[in-house]
């Protein structure tokens, strides 16, 4: 029951009419409907929640003549259930009781007060603390795409204008949003496969004029020129949809979203989706985080530092000035050992970035304020530690940290040392902060002394030794007497409750005191909540400066982390060159060296203008893929300002890194392994430049031997002669080792192995020249292929090698395929291919026949 016919509402009970009306307004999400101490779900929502959460599916009587499927969950456990739902991309509308059941006529007044979606989370319990939580929107124009991302938990708002489908795919891979909004006519839904929280939105939400008005209102500006985005039409339409969606779900002001930036691909090294996946930067091929570059590099002290590090990894810089600024900061931290003390100081700051977002949304909890107080109190010490450092970038970050003595003093006066989780029951505001609150609390807290005195006095007056004075939330204050002595109670005792062995009474005096105490408790709680709300008003004027403090602290954390990683893992500072090239001495794979059970064999690489392509040969399991990946990872690490696992490295300017390593079927798109391989190869051949780093592994293996060899040869030749990209080209086609004889700038290197009897030892050391053999049969034996099959394979190999040897003298020398003449096109066929016969008149068709005759 998803679509509600309002004409049928009269058939239902008043409560179900209220529910169905609210459900109609939130038909595309689960509705948690508060009833007492439970959230209830009905109809299809109940069935879906039962399936997703493993809760019992029951029925609640009948309404409209039919049994009502129902599922419920306790309100105090709701956060755990919400976490499960948002993790699988499900959105939830939370409907609370806002009326008083005691005074309500008919159903208690209820209202949807909160909408929880995967991309709009700010609650600490629902977020992955070391991952950005991005909401994205994509809009397709006649040419290109507009893409926007917003992290509601930090306020970071970024847009990008993307020319091609491949660029959009790369951005989706880079940002990895948890929720994606797309327009009704979006034509590339295949790109969204694998993303959980997909939301189809009406076209009007992407309207350009509406989007501009929304953004101007949000930022409080007359135009968008100051952000440098005024001409980004498509991405502004996507940003407008995001803004509308966040306003609809958050239902409050969003002051922490106060700026928008444009992501320019020219500012960072371009990494396409295949490259990010193949290099396992922040996610391994199985979808986890283990054994990734981020897992090795991330020893940050704060969650916000960890998130920034991952953004840096996915956006390696191209500007050498910015890279060197980071390097200088890391070098100074390392040389002075300042990173050691900084790590502990930064760790105590916590996740200020997300705390500030919750404060801006007025959803911060008492412990958020306590953590902010602690962080602000640590600032003077942090500033003092940084005062001895002189690297320009560190000095700039120190200035952005700021100082907030007034705000720290305010929170010190206002919030108790160890506040409760929620403001709901009070106990958050410190004694002495407000005299009126202290007075009301005094009345309430004096109750225990009064009750002790009353109990002693009544025992003495009545002579009843079992008499006790107590309190519970349901019945309030009472005098309790055993049933055996209940006949001795005075006449002014009024029976309040009968238990199995006890009677409970109230007296006029106790009733009067109860009303006074409960009144004081209520007034104290109401005043405390009022003072709590005022704290937001007192802190929010410093929101922008506090956000700048959080960003600066996060960056200091990353730089300090780089220094610690360099010291711990033996990394060195790479040198940046203005000349194109990658030269690494004794380079190591940053991930493999950490997980390998044996000592890692370091290897060099030399690529420059006169040595642009290396044909890499060697046995399977010999380390070719590891070698190529380590070159790419070291290059990337150098461009984020990190030190690298090598004795030394000289890295020139890079515009793109491409990888064609490994492949599997793309079942969702109906593409075979070979089709995936060729698609990635085509992307490289179309987009690589002389400043690109290209890794090509086993091109052509998914088809016949001669087809594969021809494709591999042509691709290598094209990259070497037409593109001139710095290329590592691994292959088992030994014919390709002849390329260095035919063209300049191409060299052979190989990884060797030593064979002894029927065993093989991989050396993992890169040497100049081509490999002598592939050792395929030996590797097959290591894999456990039966001996009978191995022996048969050896016999067949001898036959094939003998046949090849006999044919050796008749072979035509291999020549450059690109040097062959272009095939001559038939003019008649060219003319015919350009004709649409449906558009021809009889006379035009006859004339065309004569022309084709002439051309042929």
From Swiss-Prot:
Sites where the protein binds ATP: 618-625
InterPro entries: DNA_mismatch_repair_MutS, DNA_mismatch_repair_MutS-lik_N, DNA_mismatch_repair_MutS/MSH, DNA_mismatch_repair_MutS_C, DNA_mismatch_repair_MutS_clamp, DNA_mismatch_repair_MutS_core, DNA_mismatch_repair_MutS_N, DNA_mismatch_repair_MutS_sf
SMART domains documented for this protein: MUTSac, MUTSd
Protein keywords: ATP-binding, DNA damage, DNA repair, DNA-binding, Nucleotide-binding
GO cellular component terms attached to this protein's record: cytosol
Biological role stated in the UniProt entry: This protein is involved in the repair of mismatches in DNA. It is possible that it carries out the mismatch recognition step. This protein has a weak ATPase activity.
Protein name stated in the entry: DNA mismatch repair protein MutS
Organism: Shewanella baltica (strain OS223)
Gene that this polypeptide is encoded by: mutS
């Amino acid at each position: 029951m998803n679509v509600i016919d309002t004409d049928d509402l009269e058939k239902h009970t008043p409560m179900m009419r209220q529910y169905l009306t609210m459900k109609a307004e939130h038909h595309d999400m689960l509705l948690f409907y508060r009833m007492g101490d439970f959230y209830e779900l009905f109809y299809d929502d109940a069935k879906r929640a039962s399936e997703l959460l493993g809760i019992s599916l029951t029925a609640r009587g009948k309404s409209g003549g039919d049994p009502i499927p129902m599922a419920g969950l306790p309100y105090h456990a709701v956060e755990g259930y919400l976490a499960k739902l948002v993790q699988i991309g499900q959105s939830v509308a939370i409907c609370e009781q806002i009326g008083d059941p005691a005074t309500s006529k008919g159903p208690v007044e209820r209202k949807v007060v909160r909408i929880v979606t995967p991309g709009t989370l700010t609650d600490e319990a629902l977020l992955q603390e070391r991952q950005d939580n991005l909401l994205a929107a994509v809009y397709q124009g006649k040419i290109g795409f507009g893409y926007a991302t917003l992290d509601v938990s930090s306020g970071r708002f970024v847009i990008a204008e993307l020319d091609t489908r491949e660029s959009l795919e790369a951005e989706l891979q880079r940002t990895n949003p948890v929720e994606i909004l797309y327009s009704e006519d979006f034509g590339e839904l295949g790109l969204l496969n694998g993303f959980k929280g997909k939301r189809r939105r009406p076209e009007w939400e992407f309207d350009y004029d509406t989007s501009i008005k929304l953004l101007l209102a949000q930022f409080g500006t007359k135009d968008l020129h100051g952000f440098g985005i005024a001409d980004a039409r498509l991405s502004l339409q996507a940003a407008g949809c995001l803004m509308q969606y966040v306003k609809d779900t958050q239902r409050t002001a969003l002051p922490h979203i106060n700026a928008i930036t444009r992501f320019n691909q020219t500012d960072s090294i371009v990494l396409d989706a295949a490259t990010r996946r193949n290099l396992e930067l922040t996610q391994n091929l199985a979808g986890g985080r283990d054994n990734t570059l981020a897992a090795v590099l991330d020893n940050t002290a704060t969650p916000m530092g960890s998130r920034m590090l991952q953004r840096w990894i996915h956006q390696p810089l191209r500007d050498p000035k910015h890279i060197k600024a980071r390097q200088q900061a890391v070098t100074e931290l390392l040389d002075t050992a300042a990173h050691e003390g900084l790590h502990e100081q930064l760790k105590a700051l916590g996740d200020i970035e997300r705390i500030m977002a919750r404060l801006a949304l007025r959803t911060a909890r008492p412990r958020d304020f306590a953590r902010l107080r602690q962080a602000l109190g640590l600032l003077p010490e942090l500033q003092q530690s940084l005062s001895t450092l002189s690297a320009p970038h560190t000095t700039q970050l120190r200035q952005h940290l700021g100082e907030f003595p007034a705000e720290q003093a305010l929170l010190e006066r206002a919030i108790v040392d160890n506040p409760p989780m929620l403001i709901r029951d009070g106990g958050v505001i410190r004694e002495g902060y407000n005299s009126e609150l202290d007075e009301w609390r005094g009345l309430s807290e004096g109750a225990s002394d009064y009750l002790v005195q009353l109990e002693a006095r009544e025992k003495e007056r009545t002579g009843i030794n079992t008499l006790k004075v107590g309190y519970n939330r349901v019945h309030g204050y009472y005098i309790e007497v055993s049933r055996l002595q209940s006949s001795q109670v005075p006449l002014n005792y009024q029976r309040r409750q009968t238990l199995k062995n006890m009677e409970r009474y109230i007296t006029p005096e106790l009733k009067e005191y109860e009303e006074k105490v409960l009144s004081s408790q209520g007034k104290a709680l109401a005043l405390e909540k009022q003072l709590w709300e005022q704290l937001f008003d007192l802190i929010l004027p410093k929101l922008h400066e506090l956000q700048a403090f959080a960003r600066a602290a996060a960056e200091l954390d990353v730089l300090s982390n780089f220094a610690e990683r360099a010291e711990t893992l033996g990394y060195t500072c790479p040198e940046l060159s203005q000349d194109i090239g990658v030269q690494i001495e004794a380079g190591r794979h940053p991930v493999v060296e950490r997980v390998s059970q044996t000592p890692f064999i370091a290897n060099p690489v030399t690529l420059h203008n006169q040595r642009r392509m290396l044909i890499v040969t060697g046995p399977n399991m010999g380390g070719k893929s590891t070698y190529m990946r380590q070159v790419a990872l070291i290059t990337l690490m150098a461009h984020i300002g990190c030190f690298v696992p090598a004795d030394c490295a000289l890295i020139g300017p890079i515009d793109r890194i491409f990888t064609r390593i490994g492949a599997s079927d793309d079942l969702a798109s109906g593409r075979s392994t070979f089709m995936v391989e060729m698609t990635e190869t085509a992307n490289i051949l179309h987009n690589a430049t002389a400043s690109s780093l290209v890794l090509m592994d086993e091109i052509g293996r998914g088809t016949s031997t001669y087809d594969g060899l021809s494709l591999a040869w042509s691709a290598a030749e094209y990259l070497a002669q037409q593109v001139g990209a710095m290329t590592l080209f691994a292959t088992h086609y030994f014919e390709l080792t002849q390329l260095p004889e035919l063209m300049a700038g191409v060299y052979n290197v190989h990884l060797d192995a030593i064979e002894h009897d029927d065993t093989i030892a991989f050396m993992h050391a890169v040497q100049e020249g081509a490999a002598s053999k592939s050792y395929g049969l030996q590797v097959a034996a290591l894999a456990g292929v039966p001996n009978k099959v191995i022996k048969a394979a050896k016999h067949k190999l001898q036959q094939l090698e003998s046949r090849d040897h006999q044919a050796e003298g008749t072979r035509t020398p291999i020549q450059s395929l690109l040097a062959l003449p272009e095939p001559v096109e038939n003019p008649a066929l060219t003319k015919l291919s350009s004709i649409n016969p449906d558009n021809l008149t009889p006379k035009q068709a006859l004339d065309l026949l004569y022309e084709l005759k002439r051309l042929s």
